[in-house]
Amino acid sequence: DLIVGLPYENKQRFGLSFNDLFSLQPHALQIGFLKLLKGSGVRRMKEYQYISDLLAPYEVLSTHVLPYRDIRFLKHFEDVFERFYNSERFRTVFGYIGSKLIKEHTDTSITGEDTETNHVPPMKKYDPSKVETKNDAFSYFCDMTQAWLDAGNHKINLKDIDQIEFLYNFFLSKGDTVAAELLQYDTLVS
């Protein structure tokens, strides 16, 4: 499970954690949001500037490094990821996409471990300005989420065929005809 809203974790840092877990090729990856329960220690920690929903389940709405707009986007990200990847309705196409994205995953893990020598250097302070944009799983699903939002799909309840059409058009917009064909296969066998 990944939790959005942990201390010092901005959107980029969350993306690194997502990529590290995605590279393990899980059949599902659950994304949750930090809840600030009444009486909890973290709720009283002022340095994180937590703002949470006043009603249960008291989910975090913003932190000192994660503004509301990023948390809102990650809510949509979680919906899109759950709807398409975690549903396992499209195993073949996301297996193919996952294998491509994992190959392009950064050469180092979140700890900075060199994957060739297994040497772990001393931990350095995380600097989000030094994170390179790559063709990784987090970026890919962010693009998918943005396309979902741009199409206004988050405002309506789409039928399965409309969700499949969205995916098909998204894959084609990425120039990935193989993914589009695998989607057709998944649709036929499910």
Where in this protein do the model-derived segments appear?
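A structural motif corresponding to the C-terminal lobe/cap of the Radical SAM core domain
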Residues: D1-E104
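Radical SAM enzyme core and accessory elements
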Residues: D79-S190
